[in-house]
Structures are given as structure tokens and as C-alpha cells.
């Protein structure tokens, strides 16, 4: 892979990003690597000066390590002697130039994006499971749990961001294409659009699942409207759109989709019986629960419009994942599979055995009730999880172990307090990626918003100890919910990923000790 300085200049001019350029010798200079991390720079590299924490010393280090050109929003004396491309927006420039450097791998992939406050990961895994039936296992995945870029073990690895930085994204796409992948399913976060990580990408299918206040704070979105605006950009940049008609702010969501997509290519779905008098458009697909228990979920999907009838996906589906809320996630994914050319038979077969690390994983016990590990990490997902458990159990005592991350998602904390007050009998407030904040302060902030006449609380910062205490006190008819971390095998503490056994591993160890 390589890119010439001349090509960079032409691309930046085409998108009206180039403010000025300083070419040292010839525009035909070839760069053989690209990087935004000075520690990873190789000889003949193009270096991007980006990020709120960028320091000129990083450019000095990049130059010493072999960078011959840099892209930045202002010139730096540290770059003297290097080719300089000064741009209006370095994040957008990095996305465009990275795509070109990796020879536009998106053009060789059927590209699918999911956005929403909750359900992105589950929906993405459901769709991958089905598409693998279509293409023989050649579906790449970029999610907040795992990235899967090929069939070999080394092609599957833990993700660090829901949506990678643009340079990493296009590198991953190129790797997927070179590995024979034909489809890519990815979660698209609001930050991906706010920080231009997916700038220039057009998706074959774009999904909008739901929206509720989240990711609002100093380091994220200044307010809900900014959060919503960034979420909506996926629909603006998709050829076909699939929308949950039950979402809040539906009128805004649908309007965003129609700015670039013909209504004939916009598909709506909702639960059977859902009616919204303000909904001016017909719902295309309906789904209805058949049977939900603590082993599997069954539901039916029916077509309800002329364009929906063209997709042969109606029928009964079985999920190995519990939770009636997963019917919503599955329905959207099935519609996507139908639009990708799949039939009911292949969809039903592909989705039936999908499981997701850290999503609705259960541990059954003899004397300590049901233990559930789930990534539920905001008010909406917490409420959905606890309410499902109360419907499934006659008179359960719901015990929750949960914390809130530091340095981000500050707006989630009141939501935790409200959901625990509404549905939990007892909550163990504990550590969950505190970052540079004090975990005790985070827990006390959540605790201050809880009505203790409805929900008893204990603050135990040692997450492993909190899990052990919660399980130990649970009776045979109780439910213990371990929320927020899912399958994470680390705690983010003061900039370091500190090893952590994982909620499901700890839960199994505790039960083994208690019931041996």
C-alpha cells in the first residue's frame, strides 16, 4: 500500500479541505505508511497530527521515526523539512486519505451499519449469524465486543472502540477484503460521526434502532440534540434504511432518512399492536411474541406492506438469547438479511444459535437463583432487563451489581439511580472503568439519587467482592443481575487496562464454591 503526495493534494482539494501545502521537492513523493501514533511510524510515513491531546513533540518523534510528511490544521516548526499539508479538518482528511491509501476497500464490501442507544451489538451479531449462511462465513464484524476480519483465529480480536478511528477502520476493511470477506457489519457510534471516523462512507444498509439520552457530557455530546444529530447521520449516508417505528423522535428520524433516500427504500418495523396516531407512514413489518422463557425466545415476523411482501422472510423465529427485547433487535436484523437476498429458511437457521459474549449470559444455580451477565449500561437497557425478569419470575427479589464508567457518560448516572429505584430490590454499587475519576465518588453520586425506601444499596468498590456478596445472599427464587461490563476482561483505571477476570467467570467461581 502507498499513496503519493500529489494524490493527497488532489483529494484534499476535491473535498475543499486543503488550506495550504509545503512541498519540499516533488509532489510525486510516495508515502508507504500512514499513522496518527508517533510510536508506530515507519520510514516514508504520512503522519496525522490529530486529537485534543496532540502535542508538537509527537510530530518530532514521528519525524525521527521516519515520517516524511504530515497533515495538520496548522503548521508546526517541529515539521521543518517535512512535506506539510495544512487542512481545515484533520479528522476528515485522515478518513479520506486513509481510504485512498488502503485502495478504497469499502467498494468491495456489502456494508451495513447499526446505530441506536441500545441493541447495536446484539443486532450486529444477529445479522452476521444470518449473512454467514448466505456467504459461507465471509461476514466481517466490527463491534464493541469483538472485531472479526477473517476466518483465522488471529483475525478475531477484542475491540477498543465501538467504531475504530478512520485509519484503523480502513486498514481493517482492507484486511477483511484480503481475507475474502464479502460483507461487513459494524456498529456506528454517535462519536464516529462527531469525530468523522466514518466520513466519506456510504452504507448499503443503515439501521436506526432507538434513541434515549446517553453519552452526554464534557468529553462526549454537549446536549441531546447533538447526540441525536450525530446518530441520524448514518441514515443520511445509507442507500437503504431500516427504522424501528417505536423509537422516540420518530418524525426526526424518518425525516433524516428521506433527505437522501427514497421512501421506497425505507423500511419500518414495530411490535404487533403498536399504533402511533402521529405516524403518517405504514409499518412494513410486524413482530409478535410466541413464547419467551429463560431458555429461548420465539416470535413471529409478518409482512404488512406491498414492498415488505417482496422479501420472503415471514415466519416463526427462535433465538437462543433470552429477553423479549431481543425480538426487536432480531426483527431489524432479519429485515436486513432479507434485503441482502436471504430467505426465511436461511434467516431462521442463521439466527437460531447466535450467542454474544456478555449479552444475556446466564448461570443457573441450586440455591442462589438465576445469575445474568449483561452489558446493560444505561437507563433504558437496565429497565428493559429488570422488567423482563420481573415478568418471568412470580415474585423475584432483584439484586443488581452495577457501576458507571468515569470520564464519560456522566448523564447516565441519574438514569442508573432512577432505574434501580424503579425495579431493583437491592443494588451493589461498584467499580466499572473509573478511568481518572474516583470510583467511590461515582458510586456515591448514583447512590444519592436512589430512593432507599424502595431499593437498598451497598457500596463495594471491589467488583469481585460485590459479585460474591450479591450471589451469596440471593435465595433460590431471586435474580442477580451483573450489569455494565459484559464480557470485558479489564478495568480501565487511570489510563491503564487493568486485568479483570470477567463477571461471568467470577459468577461461576462463586457458585462453584458455594454449592460444591
From Swiss-Prot:
UDP-N-acetyl-alpha-D-muramoyl-L-alanyl-D-glutamate binds at residues 38, 162-163, 189, 197. It is an enzyme of class 6 (ligase). Its EC number is 6.3.2.-. Carboxylation is probably crucial for Mg(2+) binding and, consequently, for the gamma-phosphate positioning of ATP. ATP binds at residues 116-122. Keywords: ATP-binding, Cell cycle, Cell division, Cell shape, Cell wall biogenesis/degradation, Cytoplasm, Ligase, Nucleotide-binding, Peptidoglycan synthesis. It is found in: Cytoplasm. Pathway: Cell wall biogenesis; peptidoglycan biosynthesis. One of its GO terms (molecular function) is acid-amino acid ligase activity. It holds the Pfam family Mur_ligase_C. InterPro entries: Mur-like_cat_sf (IPR036565), Mur_ligase_C (IPR004101), Mur_ligase_C_dom_sf (IPR036615), Mur_ligase_cen (IPR013221), MurE/MurF_N (IPR035911), UDP-N-AcMur-Glu-dNH2Pim_ligase (IPR005761). SUPFAM superfamilies: MurD-like peptide ligases, catalytic domain (SSF53623), MurD-like peptide ligases, peptide-binding domain (SSF53244), MurE/MurF N-terminal domain (SSF63418). Coiled coil: none annotated. Transmembrane segments: none annotated. One of its GO terms (biological process) is cell division. One of its GO terms (cellular component) is cytoplasm. The modification N6-carboxylysine is found at residue 231. It comes from the Bacteria. NCBIfam families: murE (TIGR01085), PRK00139.2-1 (NF001127), PRK00139.2-4 (NF001130). Belongs to the MurCDEF family. MurE subfamily. Catalyzes the addition of an amino acid to the nucleotide precursor UDP-N-acetylmuramoyl-L-alanyl-D-glutamate (UMAG) in the biosynthesis of bacterial cell-wall peptidoglycan. This is UDP-N-acetylmuramyl-tripeptide synthetase. The lineage of its organism: Bacteria, Bacillati, Bacillota, Bacilli, Lactobacillales.
